Amino acid sequence: MPQRKLGKTGAHRKAMFRNMLTDFFRHGRIETTLPKAKELRSLAEKMITTAKTNDLSSRRKVLKYVKDKEVVKKLFDEIAPRYSERPGGYTRILKMYPRRGDAAEKAIIELVEE
């Protein structure tokens, strides 16, 4: 699957998205740039779909991306069961005003409430 490069090396991009995923599941929403939000949406949707099966293999797959065990517990015990009947579309991206310094498009990505 092609990824957005976002002007970063592979290791930097991977670390950035790991941190963003962890914060996203911890807080339920984060504010970032639009391209990062679009890429994060793809990863978050896959993590929630994986967490819905709730077995050891799924937990290990999610632990590859989300390094905080408390956040993984929250994902499996609170977030995934909330979307058990929903086939997809767990997140929403809301566009915001451009950033003042460099006019980068900003966005809020958040979990959809059932």
Swiss-Prot record:
Gene Ontology annotations of biological process type: translation
GO terms assigned for molecular function: structural constituent of ribosome
Stretch forming the signal peptide: none
Keywords: Ribonucleoprotein, Ribosomal protein
SUPFAM superfamilies: Prokaryotic ribosomal protein L17 (SSF64263)
Gene Ontology CC terms: cytosolic large ribosomal subunit
PROSITE patterns the UniProt entry points to: RIBOSOMAL_L17
HAMAP family named among the record's database cross-references: Ribosomal_bL17 (MF_01368)
Entry's family note: Belongs to the bacterial ribosomal protein bL17 family.
UniProt cross-references to PANTHER family, sorted A to Z: LARGE RIBOSOMAL SUBUNIT PROTEIN BL17M (PTHR14413:SF16), RIBOSOMAL PROTEIN L17 (PTHR14413)
Assembly mode: Part of the 50S ribosomal subunit. Contacts protein L32.
Classification via NCBIfam families: L17
Protein name according to UniProt: Large ribosomal subunit protein bL17
Gene: rplQ
